[in-house]
Regions:
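Alpha-helical architecture
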Residues: 65, 102, 174, 241-242
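Polybasic low-complexity intrinsically disordered regions
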Residues: 24-35, 39-42, 48, 76, ...
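DNA-recognition alpha helix
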Residues: 47-62
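Basic, amphipathic alpha-helical segments enriched in Lys/Arg and hydrophobic/aromatic residues
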Residues: 232-294
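Basic, short loop/linker segments at the boundary and entry of helix-turn-helix/winged-helix-like folds
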Residues: 1-43
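Major-groove recognition helix of helix-turn-helix-like DNA-binding domains
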Residues: 61-79
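Helix-centered, glycine/charged polyanion-binding patches within enzymatic domains
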Residues: 182-252
Length: 294
């Protein structure tokens, strides 16, 4: 199964490499650096493991493998990040995003005794934890419509606003009660989206401060009188789609589970998460092809 996913990843890397420039002083192409990084992530191993030829299948191994120091330096360059983004677009397909999108965050917790200088304390899974957080907007594609990796202390509302600003299009954005803020409703509407989330304090009034008219609309959608209009509740029932997206992202071999000991510092976490998203996109594409041929 790993080799089937690798075939998808390798084809996408080759397609991007065909039009991707190369610095004249580079010994190894960016495509080779990306292949080594993805091979390590596919098998949940460190980069140094993937730098040894014995750990590759002969049919998958590049002609030459970089050493660990080269990988450490090259994976922090902008061209490496740009290459990964283009591979993500290739695996994500050309389907237009849906009118209904869902936003949420997934904590990436570290042990409490971690010495990672970038990790911060914040709200984890039902407790205060230290680590990072993966923020994402999904609409059913193989890749998220937008995502970001931050420290755990970063505000989910602020990150939602940043991702909405990059989305484009229009429609409904479903979220949980943690995103209930009038300024965020106005910001989403300015970018073409109606934020739909329950009140942080249900069953109470709206207070005497400024209340966004778009927040009032969401309240009317989710709290219809006597259940006469079920459009809002039926629409919001789709918010569980992101829970399935997050669960499917971790429920297979090679998925985004806990961060391994060698993934510390923010740039390594971002590269690791991106690799796992690409691997998951390859898995989704294979599953959809199998479903169509069945």
């Amino acid at each position: 199964m790993e080799l089937e996913r690798w075939a998808q990843l390798s084809a996408a890397v080759s397609a991007v490499a065909a039009d991707f420039g190369r610095h004249p002083r580079d010994t190894y192409s960016t495509a080779t650096i990306v292949r080594v990084h993805l091979w390590a992530a596919l098998f949940d191993r460190s980069t140094s493991w993937a730098c040894r030829a014995v750990n590759w299948k002969p049919c998958t191994r590049p002609a030459e493998l970089p050493d660990q120091s080269t990988m450490s330096r090259r994976t922090r360059r902008d061209d490496f990040e740009l290459f990964l983004e283009q591979v993500g677009k290739r695996l994500g397909g050309k389907a237009a995003p849906g009118l209904v999108r869902v936003v949420d965050g997934k904590p990436l917790e570290l042990p409490n005794h971690t010495t990672d200088r970038d990790a911060t304390w914040g709200r984890g899974v039902s407790r205060t934890s230290v680590g990072y957080k993966f923020h994402a907007v999904f609409s059913g594609g193989a890749m998220p419509d937008a995502f970001a990796v931050t420290t755990l202390a970063a505000s989910e509302k602020d990150m939602a606003a940043r991702m909405v600003g990059r989305l484009g299009g229009h429609g409904y954005l479903l979220a949980d009660a943690h995103f209930d803020a009038s300024w965020l409703f106005d910001y989403c509407r300015h970018h073409g989206f109606q934020l739909v989330c329950p009140r942080a304090k249900p069953g109470t009034g709206t207070g005497h401060h400024y209340v966004s008219p778009h927040r009032l609309r969401a309240i009317r959608m989710l709290e219809p009188p006597a259940g006469v209009n079920t459009f809002g509740p039926d629409l919001y029932a789709r918010r569980t789609d992101i829970e399935r997206q997050f669960s499917q992202l971790v429920c297979f071999g090679g998925g985004l589970t806990t961060l391994p000991p060698w993934v510390r510092r923010i740039w390594r976490v971002r590269n690791w998460v991106m690799a796992k998203l690409l691997i998951n996109a390859a898995r989704v594409r294979l599953n959809r092809k199998a479903a169509l041929s069945a």
